[in-house]
From Swiss-Prot:
This is Large ribosomal subunit protein eL8B. Keywords: Cytoplasm, Ribonucleoprotein, Ribosomal protein. GO terms for cellular component: cytosolic large ribosomal subunit. It comes from Candida albicans (strain SC5314 / ATCC MYA-2876). PROSITE patterns: RIBOSOMAL_L7AE. Component of the ribosome, a large ribonucleoprotein complex responsible for the synthesis of proteins in the cell. The small ribosomal subunit (SSU) binds messenger RNAs (mRNAs) and translates the encoded message by selecting cognate aminoacyl-transfer RNA (tRNA) molecules. The large subunit (LSU) contains the ribosomal catalytic site termed the peptidyl transferase center (PTC), which catalyzes the formation of peptide bonds, thereby polymerizing the amino acids delivered by tRNAs into a polypeptide chain.
Length: 262
């Protein structure tokens, strides 16, 4: 057995620091707080979960939680896989060049056309056919079916989702590039509306052809090429922390029971 270490000698001329003993006033009694029911005032906490929110907020929250908890079929789950931020910014930058005319611009164009017709010219001489973004669900579906659409953007938050749930399959069948983007409101601002479920490009100017082809190749890599793979993946099934803790506790108890029986 090894000998115990010797005590180190104190430093010479070392003065012991005198402990300052503060005299406590006997009049002031310590009153520890008790946060039980009906006792001390509770400390400030985040009580937002107890707030009675408006019905539309409650529905939003319930819908969000249910979409996480329940098993979601692949056809609906694919709408959670939206286009990444940088590619979406490029797509909207391109589509912004081809926004439809506003009511003021339309009035100005019609005035010019009327003046041209009065002079004996045709309307096409004054205003050639504009190249604009197409919108409206029925219109875009007919463009896809006729293979006229070059790029289709679908909103991920359309309600009811059944309106657009078939579009990815239709685009894949017709070989039309498509992407799922965040926000029907963002597509709506593109076409001067509050919301829009879909937007499509049928043609672009020759200056933007290279940019469009580059964008399509990026989008196809994320959607059309991964279509078969996405068809196999179900969504949801993500449980909350309390449920996960219960499952872990049961698994631990089962493992302990097996080890004791062995």
């Amino acid at each position: 057995m090894a000998p115990k270490g010797k005590k180190v000698a104190p430093a010479p001329l070392a003065t012991k620091s005198a402990k300052s003993s503060e005299s406590k006033n006997p009049l002031f009694e310590s009153t520890p707080k008790n946060f039980g029911i009906g006792q001390s005032i509770q400390p400030k906490r985040n009580l937002s979960r107890f707030v009675k929110w408006p019905e539309y907020v409650r529905l939003q929250r319930q819908k969000k939680i249910l979409s996480l908890r329940l098993k979601v079929p692949p056809s609906i789950a694919q709408f959670s896989q939206t286009l990444d931020k940088n590619t979406a910014a490029q797509a909207f930058k391109l589509l912004n060049k081809y926004r439809p005319e506003t009511s003021a611009e339309k009035k100005e164009r019609l005035t010019k056309e009327a003046a041209a017709i009065a002079e004996g010219k045709t309307a096409k001489d004054v205003s050639p056919k504009p190249v604009v973004v197409k919108y409206g669900l029925n219109h875009v579906v007919s463009l896809i079916e006729n293979k006229k659409a070059k790029l289709v953007l679908i909103a991920n938050d359309v309600d009811p989702i059944e309106l657009v749930v078939f579009l990815p399959a239709l685009c894949k069948k017709m070989g039309v590039p498509y992407a799922i983007v965040k926000g029907k409101a963002r597509l709506g601002t593109l076409v001067h509306k509050k919301t829009s479920a879909v937007a499509a490009l049928t043609e672009v100017n020759s200056a933007d052809e290279a940019e469009l082809s580059k964008l399509i190749s990026t989008i196809n890599a994320n959607y059309i090429e991964k279509y078969e793979e996405n068809r196999k993946h179900w969504g949801g099934g993500i449980m909350g922390s309390k449920a996960n803790d219960k499952i872990a506790k049961k698994a631990k108890a089962a493992a302990a029971a097996v080890s004791t029986s062995n």
